[in-house]
């Protein structure tokens, strides 16, 4: 569990105020949820990024708010890709004994046997819905694909649960599969297809010879 300091924002702030705030390296944020009233705060962007890298997207953070320390999770955040800047954060105060359902990323581990033979690894499911208390939510769920051959697949039912959490997805939902490579045409086949295209004469649209003779009469 990582710690992060915040400073309470007093009064109503204009767009210009928020723009200057972000320009100074701070991110406007709000804290709400279990055992607390809504509080507007600001946090240092660099420090926030460090904390998220340490605990993960669903990690628990000890957020200093005034004289209090509140256990929070990041409920949501906004990011401006043009400015490469976090523009707002929602911190959710949590009850550590209350279960929550969140999305956890799937991390493929190993190299599939089928991939070594030319197969292509496809991953239709990148996140799993997980229910657990905040301290038991995994940062990622590893799925070992080492033994997968071409045309093999793994479903949610095949995912090994190594912690105190429950996966909510349909057990039959596909997580990863190894498909056969797409066969590309050989040079001979390409030449044959080009030859067929060249021998095909375009259909001429116009008067027939018979029509021309009638016209001359």
Swiss-Prot record:
Chain spans, region Disordered: 178-217
Keywords: Ribonucleoprotein, Ribosomal protein, RNA-binding, rRNA-binding
Segments of skewed composition (Acidic residues): 184-205
InterPro entries to which the protein is assigned, alphabetical: Rbsml_bL25/Gln-tRNA_synth_N (IPR020056), Ribosomal_bL25/Gln-tRNA_synth (IPR011035), Ribosomal_bL25_b-dom (IPR020057), Ribosomal_bL25_C (IPR037121), Ribosomal_bL25_long (IPR001021), Ribosomal_L25_dom (IPR029751), Ribosomal_uL5_bac-type (IPR020930)
Source domain of life: Bacteria
GO molecular function, one term: 5S rRNA binding
Gene Ontology terms describing biological process: translation
Keyword RNA-binding: yes
Pfam families the record matches: Ribosomal_L25p, Ribosomal_TL5_C
SUPFAM superfamilies attached to this UniProt entry: Ribosomal protein L25-like
Residue ranges, compositional bias (Basic and acidic residues): 206-217
GO CC terms of this entry: cytosolic large ribosomal subunit
Protein family: Belongs to the bacterial ribosomal protein bL25 family. CTC subfamily.
General function of this protein: This is one of the proteins that binds to the 5S RNA in the ribosome where it forms part of the central protuberance.
Assembly mode: Part of the 50S ribosomal subunit; part of the 5S rRNA/L5/L18/L25 subcomplex. Contacts the 5S rRNA. Binds to the 5S rRNA independently of L5 and L18.
Protein name per UniProt: Large ribosomal subunit protein bL25
Organism of provenance: Staphylococcus aureus (strain USA300)
Gene that this sequence comes from: rplY
């Amino acid at each position: 569990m990582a710690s992060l300091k915040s400073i309470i924002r007093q009064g109503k702030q204009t767009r210009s105020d928020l723009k200057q705030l972000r320009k100074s390296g701070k991110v406007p944020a709000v804290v709400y949820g279990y055992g607390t009233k809504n509080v507007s705060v600001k946090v240092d962007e660099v420090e926030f990024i460090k904390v998220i890298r340490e605990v993960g997207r669903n990690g628990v953070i000890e957020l200093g708010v005034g004289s209090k320390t509140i256990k929070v999770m990041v409920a949501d955040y906004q990011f401006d890709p043009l400015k490469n800047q976090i523009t707002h954060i929602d911190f959710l105060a949590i009850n550590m004994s209350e279960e929550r359902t969140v999305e956890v990323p799937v991390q493929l581990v190993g190299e599939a046997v089928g991939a070594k033979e030319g197969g292509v690894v496809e991953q239709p499911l990148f996140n799993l819905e997980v229910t657990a208390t905040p301290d038991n939510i995994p940062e990622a769920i590893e799925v070992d694909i080492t033994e997968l051959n071409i045309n093999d697949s793994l479903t949610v039912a095949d995912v090994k649960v190594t912690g105190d959490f429950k996966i909510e997805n349909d057990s039959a939902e596909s997580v990863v599969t190894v498909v056969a490579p797409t066969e590309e045409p050989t040079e001979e086949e390409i030449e044959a297809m080009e030859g067929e295209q060249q021998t095909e004469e375009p259909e001429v649209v116009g008067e027939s010879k018979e029509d021309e003779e009638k016209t001359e009469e």
